Amino acid sequence: QTISDYLDNLCDRGDDISERHFRQLHLAMVDALTPNGQQRNYYLYGKYQNDGGYLCMLVAVCQESLVECKGYAKIQSYLFQLCRLYTDLQVYKHLQLNIRAKKLWQWVDKENDFALPQNVFAAATGSTLGIFMLVAYMMEDKLSEKAVSALYELYFPYVQGFHILLDYFIDQQEDLAGGDLNFCRFFANDGAFYDALYHLYWKASQLAEQVSDGAFHVMLMHAMLGLYLADPKVRSINFSDELLKKILEIGRRESQFFYQNAKIYHWLQSHLPG
């Protein structure tokens, strides 16, 4: 996750916005998912060349952890597929404005096998939740190959899309100020956003019935709804209270629980010293 955030910041705010530079940077993600893998000069095509070994250190920590992953062979192909899609998204969404949209939507049309709207599919590729969940289960080799496949199909694109649409939803004003791409801007109206979010939730809930700990994965979506919508950044977005209420109702009482507790937490953070 630290690698993901660090590379996103480099792409967002760096001086070099070439495709080959972004791809070279994201080889760190590939190497991090390869136990006993190589490390290389991830800054090869960038102006900035020296981070004091920081990125290589992060890669090494991930590689060392994955050596202990007993079920790695079963999840390797899924990890690299998710990583490839994540990398492609990061590359295309950070290109120059005059070529960004064309390359991004061409890529989406080639990869999207789920009949999802372009922006929804693109959003789903931007989450790393599937990678984390696969590794978490398979550190002790807990799942069969069939169960691994079912878990992958639950998270991509449905849980991941649900996650990132909420993330983009609360970041709209921040992204607008920074000139960053935000997939929520591509919805025609609030209703279209709600419909997309509900569809992802509905599909994921169905697929969760076919995986181990299905109720846990649904609970994660309920938690995401409550936690994201309670974020103080929501106040900066121009939308109706009715939409907020309608979105929260997707997760029913469970999301309300997380929402109310997160609101209390944020209030305490802003009012208590230290």
Task: Go through each PLM region and give its residues.
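All-alpha helical catalytic cores of prenyl diphosphate-utilizing isoprenoid enzymes
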Residues: 3, 24-173, 218, 228-233
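Phosphate/adenylate-binding glycine loop and adjacent helical scaffold
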Residues: 16
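Glycine-rich, phosphate-binding/catalytic loops in enzymes
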Residues: 20-23, 181-182
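Alpha-helix boundary/N-cap detector
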Residues: 50-53, 57, 195, 199, ...
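Active-site/pore-lining binding-face segments in mid-to-C-terminal subdomains
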Residues: 149-225
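Acidic, carboxylate-rich catalytic segments that either coordinate divalent cations
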Residues: 223-274
